[in-house]
Each structure stands twice: as C-alpha cells, then as structure tokens.
Regions:
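Conserved N-terminal beta1-alpha1 strand-loop-helix module at the mouth
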Residues: 1-204
Length: 204
C-alpha cells in the first residue's frame, strides 16, 4: 500500500525543501491567525513557490471570509484548499476549486452526515476534536471509529508520530497521513531528522 505523506504547518521555504527531499508528497501552510504555525500571505507564497511539480501544495484555512478564499486562490494557487473550520458544504463548494474537508472527530459525530454534500476532490481529513483548537492538537482519536468501507480518499491526522504511524496505517489503511507537531523540535519548527524518519516509517 503506497500511503502518501503530508507535512503540515510548514513555516519556511527551507522546511518545505527539506520535507520534499525527504519524500513528502504534500506540503501544507496554515493561513489561520490563531495557529502557532500561521504564516503571512507573502511567506505562504514563498513556501508554495518551492513546491515541486508532483508534490501537492495545500493552504489550510479556518472560517475564512469568501474574499480571503478568492485571494488565496488567485495569488497562491495551491493544489488544494483545506477547510478546517465550521465551513458548510455550500461555502466550500461555491469556489469550484479542489479542496480537502477536515472532519474533527467529536465524540458524538456521525461521519456519514458530517461528510454529506461536500464536493471534496482532495478527500476528507480526519482529525482529533478539541473544543478550542482547530487542528494541531497533538492528540490522537480512536481510529476504529473510521469507516472500513469508503468511496473517498481518507487522510488521517491527529496525534501521529514516528512511533505510532505504522500502527495507524495498519488499522486505518489511509490514502494519506498528515503530521505537524509530531515532527517538530518546537511549535512551527520542523526537525529534519524526524521528518525523514516519519516518511521512512510510512514508506519503508
């Protein structure tokens, strides 16, 4: 099984280049002001400009305005948007632009209802629930809650590490795994050794 790897919360072009050299399939930048991994517009553009053809660039947003989304599409031109907030299907679909929809795994969540009507060409990313944080929790959820039978690309996030990613893949069989804090030396600072080790553990 050829599982892909997304390194999210990249904060410098150098980190993006290091991650790609290590074998990352996707590079994520966070355009959400409340995140410790948030980058400004120009820096996001600089990071995305380093992304090679064949590697996806992903712009993560949380409850952004319509005008901001159009600005991201026009000026950053990411491969995918990633909606990680409380955005409705109507909101996400209106841009007619490829996107990933993040689903935060609240305890009482019904997954089939949560994904309904989203035209998420990039798939659905399942992340841990936190009532204050939109992603980046560093906490894993119960992977057994995810559907075994599915007709969409499943991206697994939430508390992944170099140590647990093999178990995660064996349990969930995801299309892609997504990591941020699990390969950092401090918030927003990716550790090249951990990035390389994580990718080796996924693809090795």
């Amino acid at each position: 099984m050829n599982v892909k790897v997304k390194i999210c919360g990249i904060t410098t072009p150098e980190q993006a280049e290091q991650a790609q050299r290590a074998g990352a399939d996707a590079i994520g930048v966070v355009l959400y002001e409340s995140s410790v991994r948030q980058v400004g517009f120009q820096l996001a553009k600089d990071i995305i400009s380093t992304v090679d053809s064949g590697v996806c660039s992903i712009a993560l947003v949380v409850n952004a305005s319509t005008s901001r989304i159009y600005k991201i599409i026009e000026h950053l031109k990411p491969t995918f948007l990633q909606f990680h907030g409380d955005e409705s299907p109507e909101f996400c679909n209106q841009f007619n632009y490829p996107f990933i929809r993040a689903i935060r795994m609240r305890a009482d969540l019904d997954i089939s209802s949560a994904i309904k009507n989203y035209e998420a060409k990039g798939g659905f990313l399942f992340d841990s629930w936190d009532d204050k944080l939109y992603g980046g929790t560093g906490i894993r959820f119960d992977w057994s809650r995810l559907p075994k039978q599915r007709n969409f690309p499943l991206i697994l996030a939430g508390g992944l590490t170099c140590e647990n990613v093999k178990d995660a893949i064996q349990t969930v069989h995801p299309y892609m795994v997504d990591i941020s804090g699990g390969v950092e030396s401090s918030p927003g600072i990716k550790d090249p050794y951990l990035v390389k080790l994580f990718i080796q553990n996924v693809k090795g």
